[in-house]
Amino acid sequence: MNISQIMEKMIAFSNGNLHDMNHLMCVWTYAKTIGELEGLDRKTQETLEIAAITHDIACPLCREKYGNTNGKRQEEEGGPLVRSFLADAGLSAEQVDRVAYLVSHHHTYTDIDGIDYQILIGLHRKRLRKRLQPGKQEELPGRAHED
């Protein structure tokens, strides 16, 4: 599968939830652009884009199971979901492992290993900062609240 096919599959997975579809398109667009401007190699760029597309894959399940999309729950549920989602995508095991790692850590702002993780987290932290009141930015938690 190419990026467009993974995007199409993720949109279908979203079951018409316009918020989820809009969010994944925004995150993917920013991740794609930043990755290209940073000059990522092809494999890292592709991994970043797939992680950006699938990073909130657990949101529908979390809404149903827990009544919210708490970041910790997304991380717990997201890894196995994205592995299953990508099973027929024709990616290497290493690439699926990396995407699953990124999806299951996208609310964790410590121990960032790799530019793909740094870009994905950077996009999320920017969004989180918008939610905080002026003067409160220094109080960013180690894990984000629900998204």
PLM regions with names:
Residues 2-26, 58-69:
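Active-site flanking loop/helix segments enriched in acidic
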Residues 4, 28-29, 79-81, 97:
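A generic alpha-helix surface/boundary motif
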Residues 12-25, 29-41, 54, 91, ...:
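Divalent metal-dependent phosphate-bond-processing catalytic cores, especially two-metal-ion Mg2+/Mn2+ enzymes
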Residues 27, 72-88:
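An active-site-proximal "capping" alpha-helix that borders the catalytic cofactor pocket
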Residues 42-44, 95:
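Membrane-helix interface segments
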Residues 45-67, 78, 100-107:
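His-Asp-centered metal-binding catalytic motifs of divalent-metal-dependent phosphohydrolases/nucleases
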Residues 91-97:
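Short, flexible active-site-proximal loops enriched in glycine and acidic residues
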